[in-house]
Swiss-Prot record:
PANTHER family in alphabetical order: N-SUCCINYLARGININE DIHYDROLASE
Protein name: N-succinylarginine dihydrolase
Top-rank EC class of the record's enzyme: hydrolase
Keyword Hydrolase applies: yes
Active site: E174, H250, C371
Binding site residues for substrate: 19-28, 110, 137-138, 214, 252, 365
Originating organism: Acinetobacter baumannii (strain ATCC 17978 / DSM 105126 / CIP 53.77 / LMG 1025 / NCDC KC755 / 5377)
Pathway noted in the entry: Amino-acid degradation; L-arginine degradation via AST pathway; L-glutamate and succinate from L-arginine: step 2/5
Annotated SUPFAM superfamilies: Pentein
Catalysis: reaction(s): N(2)-succinyl-L-arginine + 2 H2O + 2 H(+) = N(2)-succinyl-L-ornithine + 2 NH4(+) + CO2
Gene: astB
Organism phylogeny: Bacteria, Pseudomonadati, Pseudomonadota, Gammaproteobacteria, Moraxellales
Amino acid sequence: MKGYEVNFDGLVGPTHHYAGLSFGNEASTKNRNNLSNPKLAAKQGLLKMKALADMGMKQGVLAPHERPHVPMLRRLGFTGDDISVVAQAMRYSPELLSSLSSASPMWTANAATVSPSADSQDERVHFTAANLNNKFHRSIEAETTSQVLQAIFKNERHFVHHEALPQVALFGDEGAANHNRLGGDYAKRGVQVFVYGQQHLNNGLPGPKRYPARQTREASEAIARLHRLDEAHTVFVQQNPDVIDQGVFHNDVIAVSNQQVLFHHQHAFLNQDQAFAEIRQKMASIGEDFISIEVPENRVTVDDAVATYLFNSQILTRPDGGMTIVVPEESRQNAAVWSYLNDMIQMGTPIDAIQVYDLRESMRNGGGPACLRLRVALNETELNAVNPKVLMNDQLFMTLNQWVDKHYRDRLAQEDLADPHLLMESRMALDELTKILGLGSVYPFQK
């Protein structure tokens, strides 16, 4: 049976703003309090989705979350009707309101970890929503993420949904941003590579000193168990703590995979040779080669990789069998990065083409092409069981652009978050979106 990789991109929400909430993410911190353009951000994301669908890729849409998150504001002691709750939060704690108005669910690489049926002992696709407990503004996402995923992947014969891991540091989980799957055809068994930043139950191991390691080995191992993965085809690798301290807050800022290929920086992993030997051996056990494309420090520094999000790219297998790398405009603007990319596609590796997209609104908040998408490998039967209303086509692209034009503002500052009209505009937009995408009532305000 034929297999597909379906990319589910997050639609940017109406409250997209620059709050600098993500310590360890240098772009997020640098652009704090800049004016944002939610309408442009949403349209930039939609353009990328449509372009990839037009290339013959399977492309889906994940809905934004309800923001401001009034239920959490109430848990924190603000009272009255919803508009009063938001007004009080702005008066007494504007930083808290900003945090609970973040459009961060757009970065769906952090939404969940997904294991395809070919790798799972029960031959079903497994989803575990990420708890994202390292950052308060993201720790509230798991419940809505699970609701949205269950509305898209409903059929229990094919899909299993697990609760997020416990909300404690021991099980810090940032989802697919720290997870790679290597293999051949998407419908056949692969090797899953879980990347972690620290191991809580073994304090003797090295860890970062400047910025937090958001993913723990304990979380990755728990997900592998939940997803019923075979140890013989699962690898756990520690990310180099030195690059975390240089702003590599997720593994998808320093490495990206597709099928047999792992595209990565020279300094991406701790004990890299040992890790790659294990990956190579486990790939051989499923009859596949392992192709490492390593970018040396003397061609692209870690600082340039972080600034341009070279590795926060997508590697896509085209219908003709070749691979295209999708990079942000910032990669083209950097001479060293652009020179390397153009040399790489002449090296005889499977990656032989480059596509560039302007995702500046997301990039300024610290998220590139790979942050915006959740990869789901499906066979033909499973793809047919997916809610078809979320799959990108000409009609959906037109409908969503019209929806954005109708509901989104073209500028947003932090002080606008208390505007009662923004709360009502956002809810009206999301209520309409759930009908467009056939999601049902997934938001707290709809219940």
